[in-house]
């Protein structure tokens, strides 16, 4: 997995490439941790190049969503492929998260 983070003021875009699974999810969590302490962050997760997400990856996504929204921020997932979308749908995450 490759993670690229860009920030402009309070807008943080996280681009994920590859697989978000048990092996790679701790890396993403570490990359996101600095933004968990900030108030009013608008986090956008661009999943255009994400190939797969496991339950460990879903946990990181849900933790990020809960932490950021609890501090007055927003969390949006964009550009997921059909396979990743089906995982979000089957787990009910698509009802919890903002997916564009």
Annotate each PLM feature.
Residues 1-15:
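Short beta-strand/loop segment at the start of cytosolic alpha/beta domains
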Residues 98-100:
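Short acidic-hydrophobic, aromatic-tinged amphipathic segments that line or gate anion-handling sites
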Residues 22-96:
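Amphipathic alpha-helical interaction surfaces in cytosolic regulatory modules
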């Amino acid at each position: 997995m490759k993670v690229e983070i860009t920030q402009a003021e309070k807008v943080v875009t996280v681009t994920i490439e590859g697989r978000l699974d048990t092996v790679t999810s701790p890396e993403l969590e570490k990359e996101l941790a600095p933004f968990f302490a900030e108030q009013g962050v608008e986090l956008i997760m661009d999943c255009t190049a994400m190939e797969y997400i496991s339950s460990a990856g879903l946990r990181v996504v849900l933790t990020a969503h809960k932490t950021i929204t609890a501090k007055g921020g927003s969390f949006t997932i964009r550009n997921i492929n059909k396979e990743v979308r089906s995982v979000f749908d089957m787990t009910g995450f698509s009802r919890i998260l903002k997916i564009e």
